[in-house]
C-alpha cells in the first residue's frame, strides 16, 4: 500500500525471482519517489531522533485522537467503518517496543525512504497491478503515470473507498484483484 511499493519494486528489480506478481494499492505518483533529502526534511529527521523532544513529537503525532482523525479524514471514505478495535490496534502498534516507530517516522519525514522506481518500472518482467481509489483527486493522473512506464503494468479503479480499501472494503478489493488476475489469464 502507498509508499511501501518502492521497496517491493526495487527488490524485484534487483532479483527478478522474488515475486510472481506485484499489486500496488493506492500508490503515489512514481515521480514522488524521485526526491532527495532537503535541508528542511533532514532537520525534521534530526528533531525526531533527539531522545526527549523526538519522542514527544512522535507521541503527539501518534496520539489516539490523531490516529482517529487520520482514519476519519484520510484513510476511510466511510468513517463509521473504522472500528474502535482497528483504531486501538494502530495506536498500540505505534507505541510497541518503546516507541521505536519514531525512527521510521524520522526516515519518512526526512525523505530517506524515497527511492526512485522509474528505472525499475521500465524493466519489469512480471505483472504489476495498480489499484487506485477513485476518491483520490489525482487517481487518473497516477494510474496514467504508472501505465506509461511499462506494458507489464495493468490498472484498475476502486470506488467509494479512500486510502485503505483492504480495511474499508476488503471484499470489493478482492473482487478487483480477482478481475485483474482473470484479465491476465486471457
Model feature map: region roles:
Residues 33-38, 142-144, 168-170:
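Short aromatic-enriched loop/helix-cap "lid" or pocket-rim segments at secondary-structure transitions
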Amino acid at each position: 500500500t502507498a509508499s511501501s511499493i518502492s521497496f517491493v519494486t526495487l527488490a524485484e528489480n534487483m532479483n527478478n525471482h522474488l515475486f510472481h506478481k506485484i499489486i500496488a494499492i493506492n500508490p503515489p505518483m512514481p515521480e514522488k519517489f524521485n526526491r532527495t533529502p532537503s535541508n528542511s526534511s533532514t532537520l525534521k529527521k534530526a528533531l525526531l531522533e533527539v531522545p526527549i523532544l523526538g519522542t514527544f513529537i512522535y507521541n503527539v503525532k501518534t496520539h489516539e485522537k490523531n490516529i482517529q482523525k487520520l482514519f476519519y479524514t484520510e484513510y476511510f471514505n466511510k468513517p463509521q467503518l473504522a472500528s474502535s478495535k482497528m483504531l486501538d490496534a494502530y495506536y498500540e502498534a505505534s507505541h510497541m517496543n518503546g516507541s521505536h516507530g519514531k525512527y521510521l517516522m524520522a526516515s519518512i519525514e526526512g525523505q530517506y525512504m524515497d527511492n526512485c522506481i522509474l528505472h525499475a518500472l521500465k524493466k519489469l518482467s512480471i505483472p504489476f497491478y495498480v489499484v487506485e481509489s477513485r476518491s483520490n483527486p489525482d487517481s487518473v493522473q497516477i494510474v496514467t503515470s504508472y501505465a506509461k512506464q511499462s506494458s507489464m503494468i495493468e490498472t484498475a479503479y476502486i470506488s467509494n473507498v479512500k486510502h485503505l480499501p483492504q480495511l474499508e472494503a476488503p471484499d470489493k478489493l478482492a473482487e478487483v484483484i480477482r478481475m485483474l488476475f482473470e484479465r491476465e489469464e486471457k
